[in-house]
A protein has these predicted regions:
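Expand to "…catalyze enediolate/carbanion chemistry for C-C bond making/breaking, isomerization
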Residues: 2-299
């Protein structure tokens, strides 16, 4: 396979700091029982949460708990991420600086609205990395880039920071911000405005070589609905999804992991590209369909590269 072909496929199955990043599982900050349980789950990434799952009166204690968790825990293959509070809150700045003392793999940033928001946090992290003698860029960022309306029109600029490894989206906060009465129709499908935001997140992430991460599915008692949404997301081009309940993790991992049949087909397609490339041809028929460029090498291909 040529170098160009390899470059074309490396985005399609995304990796975090420690391995694959298919499932990103929220763990409420300060809840020792849930944290201990999460370490035994098959989630690729754990998001230790200091924002929505923590009441205002418990914010400082939860921050101290999370710092202690990171300091004392061997996460193994699980990526350790922390969702801090927004920087315009009472807790945001202290969250960032305190968590940086124990060096997580990355931060999940809620309610960012502009490139200036991301640049500011990037600058603070860079300063703290230098103070601690670690490589600049070691700590990554994942943006929740659609929680305020203004952010949707700034996603491309926000994602341009080299520190940004992924972009996800969310309908919950956005629905309140725009005054939406519902997020889904009677069939469980997103209303048009949320479909637009979902697609915009995907396109902005891919355009900036960041991972597109699909939003949480809040109906934890509807595994069939989750599976359908995972399939739609994977078909669109998302390579991971956020989870909020342990029962969701295996469904998400399965949806964003290629089957053996897909891997076999990808291997055949790679071989066909190489054969026709040697013959000076870049358009040919593969399994009854026209293959005309390296973009046909999608998610399963990376498993054989």
């Amino acid at each position: 396979m040529s170098a160009n072909t390899r470059a074309a496929v490396t985005r399609t199955l995304s990796k975090g700091k420690r391995g694959l990043r298919r499932s990103l599982h929220f763990v409420p900050g300060g809840n020792d029982r849930m944290f201990e349980k999460a370490l035994a789950l098959s989630a690729d990434s754990l998001i230790l949460d200091l924002e929505d799952s923590v009441t205002p009166g418990n914010k400082i204690a939860a921050r101290e708990h999370v710092c202690q968790w990171i300091k004392e825990t061997d996460f193994g293959d699980q990526e350790c991420l922390v969702r801090i509070n927004p920087q315009d809150t009472t807790w945001g700045s202290d969250d960032l600086r305190a968590i940086m003392e124990v060096l997580p793999d990355g931060f999940v940033l809620p309610k960012v609205a502009s490139q200036q928001d991301v640049d500011y946090i990037d600058g603070v992290i860079t300063e703290l990395e230098q103070q601690q003698g670690v490589e600049v860029g070691a700590v990554s960022l994942i943006l929740i880039g659609t929680e305020v309306p203004a952010a949707i029109f700034n996603l491309h600029q926000m994602a341009h920071s080299e520190r940004v490894e992924g972009i996800t989206w969310g309908a919950e906060d956005l629905s309140g911000a725009i005054g939406a009465k519902a997020k889904r129709d009677e069939n469980g499908n997103y209303l048009e405005v949320f479909n637009f935001v979902r697609s915009t997140c995907l396109l902005a992430a891919v355009a900036c070589n960041a991972q597109p991460i699909d939003a949480v599915y809040v109906d934890i008692k509807n595994p069939e609905g989750l599976a359908r949404e995972c399939k739609t997301g994977a078909d669109m081009g998302f390579t991971g999804k956020i989870t909020i309940h342990p029962s969701q993790i295996e469904i998400v991992n399965s949806a964003f992991t290629p089957t053996q049949a897909e891997i076999d087909e990808a291997n055949e397609l790679i071989a066909a590209f190489e054969e026709y490339e040697k013959a000076g041809k870049m358009a040919f028929t593969f399994r009854g369909q026209m293959a005309v460029s390296y973009t046909h090498l999608t998610l399963p291909t990376i498993c054989s590269v």
